[in-house]
Design a protein with these regions (language model features):
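N-terminal, Lys/Arg-enriched amphipathic/low-complexity engagement segments
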Residues: 1-30
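Positively charged, phosphate-engaging catalytic surfaces used for nucleic-acid and nucleotide handling
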Residues: 1-9, 117-337
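The alpha-helix within a helix-turn-helix
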Residues: 48
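DNA major-groove recognition helix of helix-turn-helix
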Residues: 62
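Short Lys/Arg-enriched helix C-cap and helix-to-coil transition segments
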Residues: 69-89
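A short, Lys/Arg-enriched interface patch at domain edges and termini
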Residues: 88-130
Length: 337
């Protein structure tokens, strides 16, 4: 979260999509509001008072960030909905009068959204600081105190890692059998695959995630990235075998590299490469505060489903997953195939 929230839509949405952070923020900030349709909501006048801004200021932001604010809970009430709201708000100080025919209301999420946009409000600046602290606390608590291996909390991680290990062996065997060269070829060709998928070699990836020398980089990769690496390793191993058999001899490293470059360009892999780059770049910036500069163009806001995947009730540490009898039974069946 290095960027100013007022300047980055993705940074704002990464907070607003994190329901665990929103729950804690709503509890700690105690902003009040009126209970309506399952949410605490606030009128425009209440938001004006909260952030100590003018009506002209809030109208300017409602106009310039209309789509964003509406997607996060801002709505305009008319007719029956407005009548119902006025009935619920009766006796509260909503400051909008009984003759109002349209009324803009903000959910708590939309109130935070407005606070992340306002540059001329000191209360909004203070709120942003408090919210960022809450987000960091929630992230640490729900990820077990660190995010280096947050990828492993995904219930799909173990299976992806298990399969990737098998395909890795297939790939190294193909390098042995069908490609000339010394022991350095394993690292060199692995880096070619990494660069094909996420435009970084192993050393660059390790530096960006600030991994220790003992850390294995594939243990920090998301399941979708591991699965794509598996596809590349399996497919390239096959291409090496076919090309070597057709040649009647081992491939030179130049020939093998050309095959990888051709493999990378196949239209079949384009959507999967884009997905892997987007998820790696977006998740690492959000969860690990790690920026993949070569993938910056792929960064998007992390969707709500990803917060459930890595921080939700179903997410578990690797140790917890490995102690689950059902998980162990699945891996026993896979191993026995």
């Amino acid at each position: 979260m290095a960027q100013d929230l007022t300047e980055s839509l993705n940074e704002r949405q990464n907070i607003l999509n994190n329901r665990y952070a929103l729950q804690q923020a709503e509890q700690h900030l105690e902003l009040g509001g009126v209970y309506y349709n399952g949410d605490m909501v606030f009128t425009k006048q209440q938001v004006i008072a909260l952030y100590d801004i003018s009506e002209r200021t809030i109208e300017r932001y409602l106009l310039s960030h209309d789509e964003e604010l509406k997607s996060n809970g801002y709505q305009i009430l008319r007719g029956v909905k407005l009548k119902k709201f006025k009935g619920l708000a009766s006796g509260t100080d909503i400051h909008d009068g009984t003759k109002t025919t349209v009324l803009g209301i903000f959910t708590f999420r939309a109130v935070l959204n407005m606070g992340m946009l306002l540059t001329e409000s000191e209360p909004a600046k203070l709120l942003r600081s408090r919210v960022l602290d809450i987000v960091l606390d929630v992230m640490a608590e729900r990820s077990g105190g660190h995010t280096k291996f947050i990828n492993q909390r995904d219930e799909n991680y173990l299976l992806a890692a298990f399969q990737e290990d098998n395909y890795r062996q297939l790939f190294t065997d193909a390098l042995d059998d069908y490609v000339e060269g010394n022991k350095w070829k394993y690292g060199n060709f692995t880096n070619l695959i990494y660069k094909s998928i996420f435009q970084e070699n192993a050393a660059e990836y390790r530096r960006i995630l600030k991994l220790a020398a003992k850390d294995k980089i594939r243990e920090t990769m998301y399941s979708e990235v591991l699965t794509l690496i598996s596809s590349f390793e399996s497919g390239i191993a096959y291409e090496f075998e076919v090309a070597s058999n057709n040649k009647g001899a081992k491939l030179t490293q130049t020939e093998a590299k050309a095959l990888i470059q051709k493999f990378e360009q196949h239209p079949l892999y384009k959507p999967f490469i884009i997905e892997a780059r987007t998820k790696m770049a977006s998740r690492d910036l959000c969860f690990r505060d790690a920026l993949h500069e070569k993938l910056e163009a792929y960064i998007k806001a992390v969707p709500e489903a990803d917060f459930e995947r890595f921080l939700g009730e179903k997410s578990k540490s690797l140790e917890e997953q490995l102690s689950d009898p059902e998980t162990l039974e699945v891996f026993k069946r896979l191993k026995d195939r």
